[in-house]
Every structure is written in structure tokens, then in C-alpha cells.
């Protein structure tokens, strides 16, 4: 009898595939403000979060609340930041989109007012305010996509810290392995044709080839359901 495929092992669950969420620091959300309220705080610490590829900062606000938020470039321990409708336009401050001028770089943008932040949260990314059109604010996302958002949605001024992270090469396979292990991702992924026949339907043989049709039915049982599943077309370009 053959061995289980990687997808079957992942479905069963094991320490190899278990999420590392027990080490995550917190959900990063904007502090709640009401009406014209503006809350000021001071950065007390820069924190590493295994859940993210950018640094985060611990902020103690004037109302006594302490919160972890995304760190934009140019802020550090001891700096003051503010969250509210009358906050100054400077890196680290959080305002409604309606109060941010056109052409300004922003990050950690809310999708709906009060959701805490949904867009432009990865290291080194930012979005740009394109225009204010009536009841909508036009924002260009890091991907280049244009979104029209509620002007009451809040965003943080500046670029997310940690830019250039992807420019540093791993150099060694071991470094890549530790990176993927931290994300509960099994790596490297071996091709089916490179396996033994006991490990994969495409394995075995004197040379690397599937040895059978790659198209399989949608109703194929687990363990044999590999390749082009319920493919409408196959061949070059499909």
C-alpha cells in the first residue's frame, strides 16, 4: 500500500503543519476614537512579532491604554504619535482618509470604518491618496489597483517599516528552511515524478515521467487525486 500524499498529511494534522499562532503577539488594530476625539501616545518599545515580516511598536496612549501597532518608517522609541481627526500629518499618526491630503503615502488602511486596518500592512509597502470624490476617497493600492473607500476609514501616515526585506538573499538552503518552518510550511516541496512509486502516483520508473494520464476526475479518491484535476483543457498554454 502506498504512502499518504503531502496534502493528506496536512489534512490529518501534525506538528509539521501546525500553525505557530501561539507565538503571535497581537492583532494590530487602530485604537478606537469617537467623533472629533484625538488621542496621543508615546512609543515605548519596538517589538519583533513572529507573525509578521515588519517590526511593530508598543504605544502607551494618554487614556492609559497600551496597544501594539504597525511601525511606519521614521518613528522610534520616545516619539509621540496621535490618532484622531485633528492629528498632524506626519509618519505614525492615524487619521480618517477625508483628512489626509492627496498624494500622501499611507498604510494600514481600513476597509470599513472601525475594522482596525486591512490594506497595505506588509513590510515596505504603502498606498497613495489619489483624490477625494464626493462620498468616496480614491486610493491607489501597493498593487496598483484603484479602490474607492469610505472617507471615514482610517489610515496611518507613512510607509510600513522593514522595506528591502526581500532584497536580501537567503544564500543557504538552511536559512530558507528555518524561514518556512516559522510559517508552518513544509519545505522543500519534492516533485511527484522525483519520488518513489510508493510515495506518489507519478513516482518510480527509470526516468522522470508521470507514467499515466495527468488528468483525473473530480471524484477521484484521495491518494490518487493528483495532476490536472477535472481539467477542461490541457497542453501548452493551459
Swiss-Prot record:
Pfam families listed in its UniProt record: Ribosomal_L2, Ribosomal_L2_C
Family annotation (InterPro entries): NA-bd_OB-fold, Rib_uL2_dom2, Ribosomal_uL2, Ribosomal_uL2_arc_euk, Ribosomal_uL2_C, Ribosomal_uL2_CS, Ribosomal_uL2_dom3, Ribosomal_uL2_RNA-bd_dom
UniProt keyword list: Ribonucleoprotein, Ribosomal protein, RNA-binding, rRNA-binding
A GO BP annotation: cytoplasmic translation
Disordered as annotated region, ranges: 201-238
Lineage top rank: taxon: Archaea
SMART domains listed in its UniProt record: Ribosomal_L2, Ribosomal_L2_C
Similarity annotation: Belongs to the universal ribosomal protein uL2 family.
Subunit: Part of the 50S ribosomal subunit. Forms a bridge to the 30S subunit in the 70S ribosome.
Name recorded for this polypeptide: Large ribosomal subunit protein uL2
Source organism per UniProt: Methanocella arvoryzae (strain DSM 22066 / NBRC 105507 / MRE50)
